Design a protein with these regions (language model features):
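Glycine-rich flavin
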Residues: 2-3, 20-27, 32-169, 202-206, ...
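N-terminal Rossmann-like FAD-binding beta1-loop-alpha1 element of flavoenzymes
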Residues: 4-31, 175, 181-191
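Residue-level marker of alpha-helix boundaries and capping positions
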Residues: 9, 90-91, 176, 208
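Generic alpha-helical hydrophobic packing signal
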Residues: 11, 23, 123, 133, ...
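Glycine-centered short loops/turns at secondary-structure junctions
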Residues: 26, 193-195, 225
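Short beta-strands and strand-loop turn motifs
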Residues: 81, 198-202, 229-231
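Rossmann-like NAD(P)H-binding beta-loop-alpha module
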Residues: 156, 167-201, 208-209
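Internal, well-ordered alpha-helical segments in soluble enzyme and binding-protein domains
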Residues: 181, 185, 213, 217, ...
C-alpha cells in the first residue's frame, strides 16, 4: 500500500494545477492516469485544434490572394499527412515540457499509470495496488456525448478527437450540431478542401449565443462555402459503399 497526502484522478490541466499547488504547500501527491499524460487540452483539444486551424487559415489566405493580379505564390497544396505529423510533434513537445518535465521537477509528485477504482473513500486500487490519500481530487474532465440517433452505432463516425487523427482528408463531411467545436472544425476542413455540411436542429447555429451574432457568423460561414442546414433533425444514419448516409427532417422537407 502506498500513502500520499493527495491523490488526483487523471492528469489534465486542472489535475496538474492542483498537484503543483499541493506540492508547493508541502504535500505528497499521486496522479493516476489511465491514458496519455496531459489531458484534453494539450493532446486532443486546444493545442492541436488551434495549430491545425492556424494552418487552414494561412492556406485560405494564400488561396484568396489568387484573385489579385500580379501576386503569384506557385501551386499551393495541402499535404494533410505532413500537417498531422507536425501537429503530433508539437503536441509531444508541449506534453513533455508542460507536463512530464514539470512533474519530474517536483519530487513530491508521482504519476501512476493505470486506471483507478475507488474501494473506499480514501483508497483507490491501481494496477492491483492500493493507493491511499488523505484527500482525493477527482479531475476526470469530460468526454464527447454520443447522441442516440438510429443507426449511428453501426457507422464509422468521428468525434472531434478522431477528426484530428484522420490519415487522409475526406472528400466530404457531415457535422451534426452547430456549436463552437462543430463550427471551428467545419471551417477548418472546408478550408482544406473538404465539402462540409453542418446540421443544426435549432433555428440558427450557436444556439446558446446572442441570436444576431450567431446569424452573422452563420452568414459568414455560408458565404465562405459551408453548407449549413438549420431547423434540421437527424432521423437515421446508415453506412453505404461510398460513406455514411444521414437522413434528416426539416419543417419544409425530408432528404438525405
Amino acid at each position: 500500500m502506498s500513502a500520499y497526502d493527495v491523490v488526483i484522478l487523471r492528469s489534465g490541466s486542472a489535475a496538474f494545477a492542483g498537484a503543483i499547488k499541493a506540492a508547493e504547500l508541502g504535500a505528497t501527491v499521486a496522479m493516476i492516469e489511465a491514458e496519455i499524460i496531459g489531458g484534453t487540452c494539450v493532446n486532443v483539444g486546444c493545442i492541436p485544434s488551434k495549430n491545425m486551424i492556424a494552418a487552414a487559415d494561412l492556406y485560405h489566405s494564400v488561396m484568396g490572394m489568387q484573385r489579385y493580379r500580379g501576386l503569384s505564390f506557385g501551386a499551393a497544396q495541402v499535404e494533410w499527412a505532413s500537417l498531422v505529423e507536425q501537429k503530433e510533434e508539437l503536441v509531444l513537445n508541449l506534453r513533455k515540457k508542460k507536463y512530464l518535465d514539470l512533474a519530474e521537477g517536483h519530487e513530491a509528485i508521482s504519476i501512476l499509470q493505470g486506471k483507478g477504482h475507488f474501494i473506499s473513500l480514501q483508497q483507490i486500487l491501481v494496477n492491483e495496488e492500493v493507493v491511499t490519500g488523505r484527500q482525493v481530487l477527482i479531475a476526470t474532465g469530460t468526454r464527447a456525448c454520443i447522441p442516440a440517433f438510429p443507426g449511428l452505432e453501426s457507422v464509422s463516425y468521428l468525434t472531434s478527437t478522431e477528426a484530428f487523427m484522420l490519415k487522409t482528408l475526406p472528400v466530404s463531411m457531415i457535422i451534426i450540431g452547430g456549436g463552437v467545436i462543430a463550427l471551428e472544425l467545419g471551417q477548418m476542413f472546408h478550408r482544406f478542401g473538404v465539402h462540409v455540411t453542418i446540421l443544426e436542429r435549432g433555428p440558427h447555429i450557436l444556439s446558446g449565443f446572442d441570436e444576431e451574432v450567431a446569424r452573422s457568423i452563420q452568414n459568414i460561414l455560408q458565404d465562405e462555402g459551408l453548407n449549413i442546414l438549420t431547423s434540421t433533425t437527424v432521423t437515421e444514419v446508415s453506412q453505404s459503399d461510398t460513406g455514411v448516409t444521414v437522413r434528416v427532417h426539416t419543417h419544409q422537407w425530408s432528404n438525405r
